[in-house]
Design a protein with these regions (language model features):
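Conserved beta-strand segments that form the floor/walls of ligand-binding pockets within enzyme
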Residues: 13-17, 30, 117, 154, ...
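Residue-level recognition of short loop/turn positions
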Residues: 25, 65, 280-281
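Radical SAM enzyme [4Fe-4S]-AdoMet core and its adjacent flexible, acidic
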Residues: 38, 128-129, 133-266
């Protein structure tokens, strides 16, 4: 797929590499040696706005990183996204969201939902393996702050055979927080649990990469006979599906993504849903773009 100008964008989701700086050193990170590399600057606010105002259709603008909360212009970027009638969301490790005032700021600036990484669930020993640190308390506090302040969390968990056991306690904890703050899960507060396999690009654990059907089976064992939907945003997928399941606080949503790499060492290539605003402020398919950068091929 060719590089395209912003006005020709076809992707319903566009990621923005808000910053290449990070305050963690996760075992799984597709950025490889791009991480904390001064060669790669933060997004330029003016150039970002120039791209955003030229997009032809309403688009999900996904602020990613390394860690997007380390960019001091994040709230301004969110406000620009809203100004042009697009939908801002964010993928974060959640450490700064342990501060309730920061979550309130995200909500006030117009953030629609956040993807919160919780690879260890409630278990510090699992975080030590996946994220090289004990982060359970901070991430649980971040999750609670989101639910308390009506900022919808999508909880992201990379799974391999060593951490499947954290999923059920994590689901139970999410439900208990919704009970505590009287949040009915469903269309008006669409909490989603997103499970993903290990993508062997950049930095990654040398472990089994689950297929999508293995992960569907895992989720069925946890929450019942789910019905996977492989059509997302009107696009037929093979490596991604959504589902839902009943809880005592309403219908919770789920998503499963198989990050198996192809013969070129890339996951989810030629995606018709996921694009990225590149470092030269054009549009490309997400992983196809990163696959061309040497630093993603040389993990630390």
């Amino acid at each position: 797929m060719e590089v395209m100008k912003p006005e020709n964008n076809i992707f319903p989701i566009l990621s923005v590499q808000t910053t290449y700086q990070c305050n963690m050193a996760c075992a799984n990170c597709y950025l490889g040696d791009m991480l904390n590399n001064p060669k790669f600057p933060d997004v330029d606010v003016k150039k970002f706005e120039d791209v955003i105002k030229r997009l032809p259709n309403k688009t999900h603008i996904r602020f990613i990183g390394a860690e997007p909360t380390l960019n001091n212009d994040l709230f301004k970027l969110i406000e620009i996204t809203r100004k042009y009638k697009h939908r801002p969301n964010m993928l974060t490790n959640g450490l700064k969201l342990a501060q309730e005032d920061y979550v309130k700021g995200l909500k006030k600036s117009g953030m629609t939902w956040i993807g919160l990484s919780m690879n260890g669930g409630l278990d510090d020993e699992v975080y030590k393996r996946f994220d090289n640190g004990k982060y359970a308390k901070l991430k649980m506090r971040a999750l609670e702050n989101c639910i308390k302040n009506n900022l919808v969390p999508h909880i992201n968990v990379i799974i391999d055979p060593s951490n499947i056991h954290i999923l059920q306690p994590l689901i139970s904890h999410i439900i208990s927080l919704c009970k505590k703050y009287k949040r009915k899960i469903g269309p008006h507060f669409p909490i989603m649990l997103r499970v993903k396999s290990i993508g062997k690009m950049g930095n990654f654990l040398d472990s089994h990469t689950f297929t999508i059907y293995e992960m569907i089976s895992i989720m069925r064992n946890l929450v019942g006979d789910i019905v996977p939907n492989f059509t997302i945003d009107g696009v037929k997928e093979t490596n991604t599906c959504t589902f839902d399941f009943k809880t005592s606080m309403g219908k919770m949503y789920g998503k499963i993504t198989d990050w198996s790499v192809d013969d070129d060492g890339l996951p989810l290539t030629n995606s018709k849903r996921r694009g990225i605003i590149t470092d030269n402020y054009q549009i490309e398919p997400f992983f196809d773009y990163y696959g061309k950068i040497d630093e993603t091929q040389h993990p630390r």
